[in-house]
Amino acid sequence: MLQLTPSAAQEIKRLQHSRQLTRHHFRLAVRPGGCAGWLYHLDFVPEITADDLEYESGGVTVLVDSQSAGYLHNLKLDYAEDLMGGGFRFTNPNAAQVCSCSLSFAPNLEKNL
């Protein structure tokens, strides 16, 4: 299960509306890359695939492909603004290590096998 904070859900809806993607779905995935090995990938996509799992949180449907699901189980996605601007913040109980940028992580392999 994924959890979006109210501020994350509000920002996703704002982005979707401002980009005129109201018929698109919000996708959260992980991809190889970054200094810790895996990067979070956020996107709006026009279609749901057969491989997608759907989660509902904060009035937002979140699509997760089956390969990313184990890495994102119980993830909390927040959105916050500070002096440097706004950005999504990830709290991932499946991460053994998180890069200082907080956008890249190394998975706890025992949890994700």
Curated annotation (Swiss-Prot):
GO terms for biological process: iron-sulfur cluster assembly. One of its GO terms (cellular component) is cytoplasm. Pfam families: Fe-S_biosyn. GO terms for molecular function: 2 iron, 2 sulfur cluster binding. Disulfide bonds: none annotated. SUPFAM superfamilies: HesB-like domain. It comes from the Bacteria. Belongs to the HesB/IscA family. This is Uncharacterized protein slr1565. It comes from Synechocystis sp. (strain ATCC 27184 / PCC 6803 / Kazusa).
